[in-house]
Amino acid sequence: MQFNVAIMTKRTFGVIGLAVMGENLALNVESRGFPIAVFNRSPNKTEKFMAERAVGKDIKAAYTVEEFVQLLERPRKILVMVKAGGPVDAVINELKPLLEEGDMIIDGGNSLYEDTERRTKDLEATGLGFVGMGVSGGEEGALLGPSLMPGGTPAAYKELEPILTKIAAQVEDPDNPACVTFIGPGGAGHYVKMVHNGIEYGDMQLIAEAYDILKNGLGLSNEQLHEVFGQWNQTDELNSFLIEISTDIFAKKDPETGGHLIDYILDAAGQKGTGRWTVMSGLELGVPIPTIYAAVNARVMSSLKEERVAASGQLSGPSKTFSGDVEAWIPKVRDALYCSKMCSYAQGMALIAKASQEFGYDVNLPEIARIWKGGCIIRAGFLDKIKKAFKDNPQLPNLLLAPEFKQSILDRQGPWREVLMLANEMGIAVPAFSSSLDYFDSYRRAVLPQNLTQAQRDYFGAHTYERTDKPRGEFFHTEWLD
């Protein structure tokens, strides 16, 4: 298809990559009054989009990268929605010689923040702007309003801000209703999105463990689970997108069997890597994030389906049947879930704070909590409390030390511990619940047993140690066999 771009109205915004997220973001931008240009490597995909979803929209398609670039007004604003890694670099390398100083590229995929750092430096050196932008909200969020986490070239963000503010999710907030803010330079946006996904892993695993205890421990039916989760979603503590969709899931019937669909879904969870990246970053920066690690590990364990089935016939465990008051235990499970959730978010925010300090991102933690209130997968009512905690005390070292969260966890730790004991007695694995409680118990202790660890290190490797009766920074070595 040929057209004379010289006589066409220039497009305000361009999208490369027409998988469902790219399509939905293009439609979102167009619906806010911005003329769009689109391009996809496969012409068939472009033609299908133009013949179906783009009909009647102010969207123009290009069938070569050169035509696509010519369609855009300057400074060109190009959103790239392709698979992370090599495909992003390939698109950038194809665009670079066609762009002019001041033009900007936005990577809206789940790219590794280190790749975004490299791309930002490379493109800024040529006079181009680069924005690595985390996009959360899934297909629906992309279309109706996602949570956006842009980082990179500040000047490029300023050009994009009027568009991003309009396409982002909108929430009730006295500071700013749009769920978008400039996260910081370089890979800051993709870093925060990575940690968002890590927290998401933690949230999902904690909910799965609560479900396991309620269903396989207390014996609740799917109808009862639907009712309980619906009630939980009305509470200040647990009101969230993930609890809301879990409520819907328990009610969904399977058209093939007539039974509940949840009972026919294989217990093997997939993952795309952002949870693993979060865990690796936590280790590299020295920030403990055990709940998130447990959640990633739980998905890995779930993938060993055939191996687990074989092991189940050989390795026995407790066979206790619950005989207590079910109604009395449901609120205890709710409290355990909330306490664990607080720990998971505390870990994620601590990791962002450390990365911000280490990489010079200057991340505004209250703003992060604000933009996660709408559009994104981890949106939850208690994010207002997280925002307030960091706004009241910008130097807060850990979310658990904020007055409200401290009191909440202290008030609920009794039921939390009871639920873990019950799970252990019944042989129900609760790795994320357990890791959360271990995190709390470790963080609140002034003295841990790592004095023995350090003594062992000095014994076999002369790694030295500090003494409790001497100032920090003085190191000692002992000849242990003398």
UniProtKB/Swiss-Prot annotation:
What reaction does this catalyse? Answer: 6-phospho-D-gluconate + NADP(+) = D-ribulose 5-phosphate + CO2 + NADPH
EC number from the UniProt entry: 1.1.1.44
Q: Pathway involvement?
A: Carbohydrate degradation; pentose phosphate pathway; D-ribulose 5-phosphate from D-glucose 6-phosphate (oxidative stage): step 3/3
PANTHER family the UniProt entry points to: 6-PHOSPHOGLUCONATE DEHYDROGENASE (PTHR11811)
Please tell me the species this chain comes from.
Answer: Synechocystis sp. (strain ATCC 27184 / PCC 6803 / Kazusa)
Q: Which UniProt keywords apply?
A: Gluconate utilization, NADP, Oxidoreductase, Pentose shunt
> What does the record give as the active site?
K193 (proton acceptor), E200 (proton donor)
Query: Any one Gene Ontology biological process term?
Result: organic acid catabolic process
Q: Does the keyword Oxidoreductase apply?
A: yes
Q: Name one GO cellular component term.
A: cytosol
Q: Which PROSITE patterns match?
A: 6PGD
Q: Which gene encodes it?
A: gnd
Positions with a binding annotation for NADP(+): G17, L18, A19, V20, M21, G22, N40, R41, S42, V82, K83, A84, N110
What does the UniProt record say this protein does?
Catalyzes the oxidative decarboxylation of 6-phosphogluconate to ribulose 5-phosphate and CO(2), with concomitant reduction of NADP to NADPH.
List of residues binding substrate: N110, S136, G137, G138, H196, N197, Y201, K272, R299, R457, H463
Query: Known Pfam families for this protein?
Result: 6PGD, NAD_binding_2
What is its quaternary makeup?
Homodimer.
**Signal peptide positions on this chain:** none
The protein's name is 6-phosphogluconate dehydrogenase, decarboxylating
* InterPro entries named in the record: 6-PGluconate_DH-like_C_sf, 6PGD_dom2, 6PGDH_C, 6PGDH_Gnd/GntZ, 6PGDH_NADP-bd, 6PGdom_BS, NAD(P)-bd_dom_sf, Pgluconate_DH
Q: Which family does it belong to?
A: Belongs to the 6-phosphogluconate dehydrogenase family.
What's a Gene Ontology MF term here? NADP binding
